[in-house]
Amino acid sequence: MKFVDEARILVVAGDGGNGCVSFRREKYIPKGGPDGGDGGDGGDVYLLADENLNTLIDYRFEKSFRAERGQNGQSRDCTGRRGQDTTIKVPVGTRVRDAVTGEVLGDMIRHEQRLMVAKGGFHGLGNTRFKSSVNRAPRQRTMGTSGETRELMLELMLLADVGMLGMPNAGKSTFIRAVSAAKPKVADYPFTTLVPSLGVVRMDNEQSFVVADIPGLIKGASDGAGLGIRFLKHLERCRVLLHLIDICPVDGSDPVENARIIVNELQQYSEKLAEKPRRLVFNKVDLLEPEEARQRAQAIADELGWEGDFYMISAINRQGVKALCWDIMEFMKTQPRNMSRTEGETQPEKVEFMWDDYHKKQLEQVSEVDDDWDDDWDEDDDEGIEVIYKR
């Protein structure tokens, strides 16, 4: 299945039903009074996080979603039925933005999490609502308001504990194949990995973590070179980054310069992402003698100004891989999972919808001193049904 991590959709909430103007008609009750019911509220539009989905490809073809309109009010004080809500399923890890304002509406980070993205219109009021001591036969009603319309930008950001960085052919896909059951494509040419992939590393029956493999970066990626940096967003929720360095590049390039390119592109993309905890990992050490590999790794770390330990592995032979994974697992215990999913993200403020306060103000605008509101008809009164608050 094609991996799609961005989609633009239109959501339209249902309109509110109109209020009804009706009077009680019953034998032996000549003046039954008003009995017009209210309309029903329009249906809302929700997003629902589903862990069984892993791409937004469905929304490249179906781009418009509409909730049901509320029914109109009826006589005998019958309220119209509320419009049915519309629920849109998205993968866990989806960030929702208003495409027009750029406002972040929410992050779908838990299975079955629900988020309202468009609020249905408020119901209209029937003429029963307007009866009073001076107006016992009102002919006023209100119309239902329009449902809210939003254009949304959906951005899928993978939820992983560990993210891998490196130049093309640094051995990232080989590493994820060695530590998990994931089987990304591995070949001897650059950009074998074209889309992100996830692998679950199980240390024992109770301990595990998730690793994300993204396409390699090259110099100028922040300006669109290669596959660009569009996949770096998938590392924003990771707790730790693994910087894989090919200790003996086949193309003869300088490992120090390659490492600096990755760090530079990371900083240009996001300062917060560049400040995440990182582990320096030298891969393909099996191509050199053990002592030569250790000396070269130490020299590269010194030139980079790296402070702290580094790791020497051979992903294809699984040499040193187990020790690296256990060290990562121990680090995971010091970094709570909920922090990793909110770090670098601002908690979205409460989303304001169009009709949140409409019902509070609607009746306050009614003036009872107007001559049109009494029971007696005179030349100053209008004939027929009066519709008020139409928007």
Swiss-Prot record:
Cofactor entry: Mg(2+)
A Pfam family matched in the record: MMR_HSR1
Gene Ontology cellular component annotations, sorted alphabetically: cytoplasm
Every OBG-type G domain range: 160-333
InterPro entries: G_OBG, GTP-bd, GTP-bd_Obg/CgtA, GTP1-OBG_CS, GTP1_OBG_dom, GTP1_OBG_dom_sf, OBG_GTPase, P-loop_NTPase
GO BP terms, alphabetized: ribosome biogenesis
GO-annotated molecular function: GTP binding; GTPase activity; magnesium ion binding
Record-listed Mg(2+) binding positions: 173, 193
Residues noted as binding GTP in the record, renumbered to the chain: 166-173, 191-195, 213-216, 283-286, 314-316
Gene3D superfamilies attached to this UniProt entry: GTP1/OBG domain, P-loop containing nucleotide triphosphate hydrolases
Sorted UniProt keywords: Cytoplasm, GTP-binding, Hydrolase, Magnesium, Metal-binding, Nucleotide-binding
Primary location recorded for the protein, binned into one broad class: cytoplasm
Superkingdom of the organism of origin: Bacteria
EC number(s) on file: 3.6.5.-
Domain Obg: 1-159
Compartments it resides in: Cytoplasm
Subunit structure as annotated in this protein's UniProt entry: Monomer.
Function: An essential GTPase which binds GTP, GDP and possibly (p)ppGpp with moderate affinity, with high nucleotide exchange rates and a fairly low GTP hydrolysis rate. Plays a role in control of the cell cycle, stress response, ribosome biogenesis and in those bacteria that undergo differentiation, in morphogenesis control.
Family to which the UniProt record says this protein belongs: Belongs to the TRAFAC class OBG-HflX-like GTPase superfamily. OBG GTPase family.
HAMAP family: GTPase_Obg
Record-given protein name: GTPase Obg
